[in-house]
């Protein structure tokens, strides 16, 4: 991917440095991405989370990003995506590298809508990128969530006449199913009793009829359909330190200072050194190790260097 990007930019006559999004909401250099490609995993949802916070003007929130195939729900903490505390499985293998805390469900604009005798099912099957070929409003033959939104007057795309025959009760039942499943996913992301607003973004945001959630407002920011691109555009270069320190040999303040210096050093280069800030610091005592051991994790970030 790095080599292909270099070739594409060279073809366009662009010779400036370029960056890749990483899955903590910051940027990394092309060289760093080539060495640690795993850092790009799930960077798409983190861009949406950061972009949603920027567009809504909030630092702490729950973010719902509804795309064409899936809905991703994440948490924004102090302006950055919350990291998962659990192990992550990829291709059936347990991993221990950093990943954002996400709940994903198979509902999006391209989701199949199946109508039964007593209920309506939405997803997880989807027409995906073939939406404009297979959805009813685009002269296709598959009933999708987008068709439901058009029939309900929530979206103005395609040919509304193609879904005018849908019974109102079925349309309302499908929308209720979507809203119910999204509410459950949002509930799964709540780890405290803090009152957090919910930000709804993505091209499929009109599918959800929520105006409030547990007494908190649901924010639908302007330009929310491009929150992913916005999150990538506003991202800062990032650096991180994650080490265990023995406090029998140094003070806690010295350990924190060393960790901050390492995070800043990783960040400087792709970022302007004077603008680098510490955006996150966690210190976790490790009682199962001898002595006074503590795991210190520090994240630094700053705007890309000119």
Model-predicted segments: where are they?
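Glycine-rich phosphate-binding loop and adjoining helix at the ATP-binding site
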Residues: 1-20, 39, 46-47
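Acidic-glycine-rich active-site phosphate/pyrophosphate-binding loop
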Residues: 15-31, 200-214
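Conserved P-loop NTPase mechanochemical-coupling segment
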Residues: 26-27, 31-38, 167
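Helical "lid/coupling" subdomains associated with nucleotide-phosphate turnover
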Residues: 38-60, 74-306
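Generic enzyme active-site microenvironment
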Residues: 63
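Short acidic, Gly/Ser-rich segments with clustered Asp/Glu that frequently serve as metal-coordination loops
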Residues: 69
């Amino acid at each position: 991917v790095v080599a292909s990007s270099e070739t594409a930019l060279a073809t366009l006559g662009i010779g400036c440095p370029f960056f890749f999004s990483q899955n903590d909401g910051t940027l990394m250099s092309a060289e760093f991405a080539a060495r640690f490609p795993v850092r790009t995993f799930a960077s798409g949802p983190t861009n949406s989370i950061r972009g949603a916070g920027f567009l809504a003007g909030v630092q702490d929130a729950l973010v719902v990003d509804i795309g064409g195939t899936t809905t991703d729900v994440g948490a924004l903490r102090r302006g950055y995506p919350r990291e998962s505390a659990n192990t992550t499985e990829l291709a059936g293998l347990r991993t221990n590298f950093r990943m954002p805390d996400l709940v994903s469900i198979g509902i999006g604009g391209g989701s199949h809508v199946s109508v039964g005798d007593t209920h309506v099912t939405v997803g997880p099957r989807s027409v995906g990128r073939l939406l404009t070929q297979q959805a009813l409003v685009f002269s296709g033959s598959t009933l999708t969530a987008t068709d439901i939104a058009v029939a309900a007057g929530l979206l103005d795309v395609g040919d509304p006449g193609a879904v005018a025959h849908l019974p109102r009760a079925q349309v309302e039942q499908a929308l209720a199913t979507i809203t119910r499943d999204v509410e459950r996913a949002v509930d799964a992301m709540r780890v405290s009793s803090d009152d957090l607003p919910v930000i709804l973004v993505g091209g499929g945001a009109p599918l959800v009829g929520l105006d409030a959630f547990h007494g908190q407002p649901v924010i639908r920011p302007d330009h929310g359909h491009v929150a992913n691109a916005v999150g990538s555009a506003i991202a800062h270069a990032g650096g991180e330190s994650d080490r265990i320190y023995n406090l029998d040999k140094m003070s806690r303040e010295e350990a924190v200072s060393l960790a901050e210096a390492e995070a800043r050093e990783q960040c400087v280069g792709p970022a302007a050194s004077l603008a680098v800030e510490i955006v996150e610091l966690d210190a976790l005592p490790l009682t199962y190790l001898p002595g006074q051991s503590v795991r210190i994790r520090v994240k630094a970030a700053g705007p890309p260097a000119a």
